[in-house]
Amino acid sequence: MNAAKVLDDLKRRFPNEPEYHQAVEEVLSTIEEEYNKHPEFDKVNLIERLCIPDRVYQFRVTWMDDKGNIQTNMGYRVQHNNAIGPYKGGIRFHASVNLSILKFLAFEQTFKNSLTTLPMGGGKGGSDFSPRGKSNAEVMRFVQAFMLELWRHIGPETDVPAGDIGVGGREVGFMFGMYKKLTHEFTGTFTGKGREFGGSLIRPEATGYGNIYFLMEMLKTKGTDLKGKTCLISGSGNVAQYTAEKVLELGGKVLTMSDSDGYIYDPDGIDREKLDYIMELKNLYRGRIREYAEKYGCKYVEGARPWGEKADIALPSATQNELNGDDAKTLVANGVIAVSEGANMPSTPEAIKVFQDAKILYAPGKAANAGGVSVSGLEMTQNSIKLSWSAEEVDEKLKSIMKNIHEACVQYGT
């Protein structure tokens, strides 16, 4: 296998999909040497079968806003690979969503899910609809229209969606409710459901908690932990919130959080009370992070990301390609000892090279943020056996999975 040749061929066949090309390039460049030790792989064209999705669904979503106007959006579901289990991956509602982004996410999801050792394939879906600024009624009408097409392509043994950016408990609840209405079935077809109707304890916290459990395993290899360490966190959604919560629980200090408008820097640290305010601001009122700065009198930088601030650990938890090569150089120069990715592909290839050259601890999102899908897999298990585990049971299983993923990375990684 010649990685450059395979990538060029994919670019020719699937042009104008930069995020997908980037994700494939990152994987091919790291496995090329090992792959070529196995000529039997090429005989069955394994690499193309791994890179190209099994199927892609695209559809128009037509819905009515509160003013009675008809709106249209695009809906997608990428079913990438089901070699080891049903397709599994979130649904994203954001104006930036396109086929390239969803193909990259589904590709990454396939590897992430396999690392958990749970029987889950990889998939991803979503729409260019943004819940921001929409009423509950508008979100519900859109979701119901979205599900009128999606429901026929999913199922507990076929494809099990979950939440992602723009899709939280409210949206998953609307989707699951519409799915039940259309199918007349109560099955584990969605994860991230409300606790009252088949959801799992620890699922909302799982991606953030899992990232910190993975980080702790990395820090152990250097004989240290989170106590007294300062942390830069990007984002202020689900992943960032529970990343911050676990950092505080383990004795670390959170200095920053952000949203698409800018970031806050609180030198006194975002403590439990302040984090509760952010959770209420974001989850209940759908507010902006600058309101935190107005309330607590700390620094707010508009239109920027927090990577120029000085800290011990960086935890990118917002979105893809949010941390570039220059940001990485600044972090290294400021003495960062570890970077652990809570988001999917938040670091550009240039940034990753900077971290690797500097020999700091670096955890790629495929491994570090696998906690969310791990607990989704545990939710699927609980649904299938009609049992519900305690928070302590689920958390212990999550810790064990993240520890095993770290051990696999140490054993087989480069």
What label would you give each PLM region?
Residues 2-23, 218, 317, 332-414:
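Adenosine-phosphate binding glycine-rich loop
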Residues 59-124, 128:
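Phosphate-interaction motifs
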Residues 104, 158-162, 186-190, 233, ...:
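General beta-strand structural signal in soluble alpha/beta enzymes
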Residues 94, 113-227:
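Glycine/serine-rich phosphate-binding loop and adjoining beta1-alpha1 elements at the start
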Residues 301-311, 321-338:
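Rossmann-fold NAD(P) dinucleotide-binding segment
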Residues 40-71:
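Structured beta-strand/loop patches that form or line metal/cofactor-binding pockets in enzymes
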